[in-house]
Regions:
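Extended hydrophobic leader/signal-anchor segments used for secretion and membrane insertion
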Residues: 1-136
Length: 136
């Protein structure tokens, strides 16, 4: 009886974790940081996790935006919001803001957290080990 209850509780916890993970994956995406314009906050090799949407964007947020010539997009910090609602951006390592403010419809997402260089690899290796141990 106790064993059946323990199995049921574990199964419920796994289902809950799977539901949370599915929701997070549907609402967030991972972006590889490929350059140094956001250093020291983000450096090349970091893995940035961004949430979809533009709600609640404010000065100081780091956003992923579409930029011509940059297929993966650009991660830069919001330094101002213009009178017409466009975002003035600047990379933390850049001395001046980007030339053209971007409209909200160019925003792909807002930075939620990041995994520093090396930690991303370790995280996914650990995740793979956990999944493998559960399957065997």
């Amino acid at each position: 009886m106790k064993r059946a209850r323990a199995v049921a509780v574990k199964a419920a916890m796994v289902l809950l974790a799977a539901a949370v993970a599915a929701w997070a994956l549907a609402c967030m995406k991972a972006v590889y940081v490929g350059g140094g314009s956001m250093s020291p906050a983000l450096i090349a090799g970091d893995l940035a996790i961004v949430r979809d949407g533009t709600s609640g964007i404010k000065v100081g947020d780091v956003v992923l935006v579409d930029k011509p010539g940059w297929p993966a997009g650009v991660l830069h910090r919001v330094v101002a919001v213009t009178f017409d609602g466009r975002l003035q951006l600047r990379g933390d390592a850049n001395p001046t803001p980007d030339l053209d403010p971007v409209p909200l419809d160019a925003v792909r997402g807002v930075l939620v957290f990041f995994l520093p260089t090396g930690h991303a690899i370790a995280f996914f290796e650990a995740l793979a080990r956990v999944v493998q141990s559960r399957l065997t």
